[in-house]
Structures are given as C-alpha cells and as structure tokens.
Amino acid sequence: MTAITDIIAREILDSRGNPTVEVDVYLEDGSMGRAAVPSGASTGAHEAVELRDGGKRYLGKGVEKAVEAANTEIFDAIGGIDAENQIQIDNIMIELDGTPNKSRLGANAILGVSLAVAKAAAQASGLPLYRYVGGASACLLPVPMMNIINGGAHADNPIDFQEFMILPVGADSIAEAVRMGSEVFHTLRKELAAQGHNTNVGDEGGFAPGLKSAPEALDFIMKSIEKAGYKPGDDMCLGLDCASTEFFKDGKYVLEGEGRTLESGAMAEYLAELAANYPIISIEDGMAEDDWDGWKTLTDLAGKKTQLVGDDLFVTNSARLRDGIRMGVANSILVKVNQIGTLTETLDAVNTAHKAAYTAVMSHRSGETEDSTIADLAVATNCGQIKTGSLSRSDRLAKYNQLIRIEEGLGPQAQYAGRSIIRG
C-alpha cells in the first residue's frame, strides 16, 4: 500500500528568485509527500553539488536537468519500492548517481526525492513528519538562533562576519522564544533607524546596516536586548557565524571592514576574546574550512565554554565529522540537508555527533522556500537548536510557525531546550 507509484518533479523559485527543485512523491494508497530544496550563497568546497543547467536560461541557474533526473532515472530506479524503506531508497539513489558528491544526478534532485519520500510515508502512516522520523521520543523544541544582523556574503555592507544571532535561552517554550526574538528584532530596527542606518533586510531577514566591526554590531544587539526588557546572558545569549572561509586569503584572515589581517592564531584569539567580552555561547565557522590547525587552536582556547560549530568544516558529512572528532576539533556540527543530499545521511551525521557528545544545529540555507521540513527534523532529532533566519520574510517564518504548531501538537510532552544548550 505504500509503494512509490509516481514522482513529479518541477522547477520552482526560491526566496532569492532563483530556480530550485520541488518534488511530489505519490504512493499506492494515494498518499503524497512534497519537498522543496534550498540552496546556499556561501557554500563549502566539500558540499554535495546542486546540478545547474548553465546557458542563458535563468542566467545559467535553471534546474531542468535535475528535474528530468528525478522524473525519469530516479523514478525508474525506486518506483515500486515501499516508501517506508528510506535507507534502501537513499542508498539506491547514491549508487545510481555514482559520484562522491552527487554531481551527476544533482544533490538537489536526490534530496528532493529523499525528503518527499519520507513525507509521503509519514502521511501514509498518519503521523506528523517529526514523529514518523524521530519516533516516540521526539519532543524537544529547539532554541532558535535568530540572525538579526547580516554581513559577509549575505549583505552589501562592510561587516566581515556573516551572521549575528540572538538565542532566547530564557524562554519557557518555542512560542515564547519567537515572541522574545520578535520584540528584540523590532527594537533593533528602531535603534538602527534612530541612528540613521538602513533597515532593509537581507537574504535571511536580518538587517544589513553599514557597521564596520563585530563589536559595533554586538553592541547594537546588546542595547536592543536591554531596551526590549531582557537581560543579555540570562534571557538572551548571542551567537556568531563568521563564515571565515569567505575572507581567508593566502593563509590569513583578511578583515576588510575592520582594516586588519590576522594570522590563524591571532584570529582564534580574537574570537575567544569576543566570547569572553559578550554573552556569546556559539561561534560557527570561526576558522576556515581547511584550516584544521586554526580550528584546533580555537577549540583549545574557547571550546570548554563556547559551542564551536562546523559548517563549511564538516558540510553535514559524517566522514569529515569523524575526522574532526578524532582531532579534537570543534564541538558541534551544523546540519544542512542539501549539503549531503539525503535524509539518511543527514540523520547519520546527527547521530555521529551525538555519540561523540558533539551538539547538532539544524539549519536552513540563505536561498529558502516555504517548505518547513527542517522544523520537523529539528524536533525529530532532538538536536535542541535550529538556525532558520530572522523574524521577517515568510520563507523564514514558515519554519518558526511550524515549530509553534508542533509544540501545540505535542501538548504537555513538549520540552523547550532553553538553557540546556549552554556549555560550561
């Protein structure tokens, strides 16, 4: 009754107006699952490859080849298989592609099918996706890491670091966390406007003011937290995504906005100093993706008290994560479903992290859609943290709204991760 009977993939647009892949998977009993695939602006060199068409259409960014792969070759390989056999289906697609980075069929085609299969199977079983994937123990609502000031590749301003985030650890529920975040977001808007800064929002819904340094951005956020009636370090903590690979040139970190260039050791010391001076509990991609020595230095300096998240470093890849664990590098992994390309491999990365006492953070991409699958996956994996942008843009809010619905559905079972995510 839950055998796959049809796959219909199509080209739709993401939040940046670029094409992406959406897939519908139909089952014998009439159940249907739909998934849309996100894409990133700052991408790690070791990520799975999203297949783009090239040529003039959509300035080379069309995804008709990936759509065709899903509709024909992938369907021919998995049609008739029971959708509940997720691992088997994902492995068939990996083998069918035959490349180490899914570049032949495209990670965008493979992931769209993988997630749609899971959603169809969940519908057939009469369960919400988080319960179908995570089982009876899936009840932990994640602390949202809300990106309210953007820099780097996500904004046209001088700030070197890509994201400055607030984490409402003092909330009692996800609904309260979203309210607290919204209040700080709108307070920050007023503060920026009052000092003559632009309050347009970037790809992920955060502001992109013409500030020059990380401390300047952090000071604005600290003041806004207090003006909104909250206590920094108690009600609200801070997080950074440095995206350091973007400004790592010739073995050095070139902070153009701050007008200085740092050696690897000095960069690690700078980040440790920021974490000591502000209530920063999480730093993502503090060092460049292949600067393993720099990562080790940063981990030794700040890893006991600060969550050090590998995004470009690990690219949701269990093999790279195991390398990091063996070397004592970082202590957390960012989980982006399209970095690895199947649900099975995504869950494996989270499990690998948890077994090594590393944390995992479920994450969106800068190019998103209204698809809210990652909200369910955050709860399914009990990972306790989610990055899904700011408190504006419906492509970001779709995930927050889904978390609110999940919390309501769980009722008294629901637990909010809150301060349990803080290290040290």
UniProtKB/Swiss-Prot annotation:
Keywords on record: Cytoplasm, Glycolysis, Lyase, Magnesium, Metal-binding, Secreted
Chief location: cytoplasm
Recorded metabolic or biological pathway in which this protein acts: Carbohydrate degradation; glycolysis; pyruvate from D-glyceraldehyde 3-phosphate: step 4/5
Keyword Metal-binding listed: yes
Positions contributing to Mg(2+) binding: D241, E284, D311
GO terms under biological process: glycolytic process
Record carries keyword Lyase: yes
Enzyme class of the recorded protein, top EC level: lyase
Cofactor: Mg(2+)
InterPro entries listed in its UniProt record: Enolase (IPR000941), Enolase-like_C_sf (IPR036849), Enolase-like_N (IPR029017), Enolase_C (IPR020810), Enolase_CS (IPR020809), Enolase_N (IPR020811)
Positions bound to (2R)-2-phosphoglycerate: Q162, K336, R365, S366, K387
Localization, UniProt: Cytoplasm; Secreted; Cell surface
Cofactor note: Binds a second Mg(2+) ion via substrate during catalysis.
List of catalytic residues: E204, K336
GO cellular component, as recorded: cell surface; extracellular region; phosphopyruvate hydratase complex
GO molecular function annotation: magnesium ion binding; phosphopyruvate hydratase activity
Domain of life: Bacteria
Reaction catalysed by this enzyme: (2R)-2-phosphoglycerate = phosphoenolpyruvate + H2O
Residues making up the signal peptide according to the UniProt record: none
HAMAP family: Enolase
Similarity section: Belongs to the enolase family.
NCBIfam families, sorted: eno (TIGR01060)
Protein role: Catalyzes the reversible conversion of 2-phosphoglycerate (2-PG) into phosphoenolpyruvate (PEP). It is essential for the degradation of carbohydrates via glycolysis.
Protein name (record): Enolase
Record organism: Rhizobium johnstonii (strain DSM 114642 / LMG 32736 / 3841)
